[in-house]
Amino acid sequence: MTATFLLEIGTEELPADFVRQALDQLQQRVSRDLREARLGHGAVSVFGTPRRLVVSVADLEDRQPDLQEDRKGPPVAQAFKDGIPGPAAIGFAKRCGVDPSALEQRDTPKGPCVFATVLTPGQACVELLQGLIPQWIDALQGRRFMRWGTGAQRFSRPIRWLLAL
């Protein structure tokens, strides 16, 4: 299922040149991070006024797709002794989070190696966004930044509210 995501950063009066810079940075960063997080989405649009920075993401998927990857391990000669998994195979299986009996042998240009198929379930979009939104705000760069309150947060002007729908 897809939905439109909206992030609004409400601030005190921002300098005009910072609004333009921040919107460009937000558009690039949001697009890149959603792609890296394997979240399908449509167009990323940005809007700004002197007191608001807004990002809108059309058709954002509600969760990541599951990721299935094949991981290459040690050569078969090191991993198995007489068909029984040795320390190398057991350690590789443990590192991949699979049972040693699930390991497969495949031929590679460097000889037969052990492979593990690892399935990583996709996370919910909401969980991913909880980590991404603060990163997007912290990554914004500009000429003059200030701190306010007791936190370490830096921004062009004090942030008064965040809206994420």
Each model region followed by its residue ranges:
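Long, basic N-terminal domains or extensions that often function
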Residues: 1-165
